[in-house]
Regions:
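Sec-dependent N-terminal signal peptides
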Residues: 4-17
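Acidic, serine/threonine-rich low-complexity disordered tracts
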Residues: 21-105, 109, 113-204
Length: 204
């Protein structure tokens, strides 16, 4: 009887705890990805509204730091395959990125290179930056706590940092994490000259 009661308690607790979610099944046209941003002692939200996923990602964006700070990012199909440069500094209005540049998403080539622990892949953290060898180095996956339509969930994330020649992290604070899915390689957190973290997903 005590065992049954304990099992019931554990089941109840599990309902109120964070459950892991699959972003590939969640992120569709119309989905909103809401990121918390910290930069220059400012805090605000970056709201990404997905418009298309194929043949390339297109999304509207809005920042809540001031009025009319919004636009649209369009990627090329080639960029989704092989781009190695991140576009992090948004300019209001429509913007079509070139074949070498991606925003919020990772290319298939970058994802594949990052998923080889200790090996890394050369990429630019910002337009105009010198390429850095970024890579994963630990097998223990982390989990990011988020809200999905108001419900507590977790997302499995992979941590990437700049690596030295031996395949171990160099001593700086630059990093990003990404969703552990080749079909939905979305940036979850990033620290560069700013800090950004996915905090909520809305599908309705």
């Amino acid at each position: 009887m005590k065992k049954i009661f304990l099992l019931q308690i554990l089941l109840i607790l599990s309902i109120f705890s964070f459950a892991q979610v699959n972003l590939q099944s969640l992120v569709k046209p119309g989905t909103k990805l809401i990121y918390a941003v910290e930069t220059n002692e400012q805090k605000y939200d970056l709201i990404i509204t997905v418009k298309a996923l194929a043949p390339a990602v297109v999304f509207d964006w809005e920042m809540t730091d001031r009025a009319n700070n919004n636009g649209t990012i369009t990627h090329t199909p080639q960029a989704m395959i092989s781009a190695n440069t991140m576009y992090n500094y948004f300019v209001p209005g429509p913007k079509t990125l070139d074949d070498n540049t991606l925003c919020v998403w990772l290319s298939k080539n970058i994802f594949a290179g990052l998923m080889k622990p200790g090996k890394g892949i050369m990429m630019k953290m910002n337009i105009g930056d010198v390429p850095k060898k970024m890579g994963t180095y630990a097998e223990d996956n982390e989990e990011l706590k988020i809200l999905v339509n108001g419900e507590k969930e977790t997302v499995e994330e992979e941590l990437a940092k700049e690596l030295n020649g031996e395949g171990t992290p160099v001593g700086n604070d630059v990093f990003f994490t990404f969703n552990n899915s080749a079909k939905m390689p979305v940036i979850l957190r990033m620290r560069n000259d700013f800090y950004i973290v996915l905090k909520e997903i809305k599908t309705k």
